[in-house]
Amino acid sequence: MPAKYWYLAEGYTGGDFDTYVLIMNPNDTATKVDVNYLLPGGGIKAVSYQVAAHSRYTIHADSIGGLTNTEFSTALTGDLPVICERAMYFSMPR
């Protein structure tokens, strides 16, 4: 169900982990989504994104300055209701 507020526990960008935050905008107009990455020790990395109408926006957290090799959680606020999820991948050596 679309909502204006989303809280995603656990994200990690160290080692062989890749974390993605996915935002789906089901609305007829574009919307701004403010994303706060909550860091260990109380720090916050704030970034805003414009998400087009009827589209999904993918954020590769590993590529954001200040999120290299760290754990975090994520708080998102949309101007309009959106749908969010967090995906994590781990590359295990064979």
Language-model regions, residue ranges each:
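Gly/Pro-rich, tryptophan- and cysteine-flecked surface segments typical
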Residues: 1-94
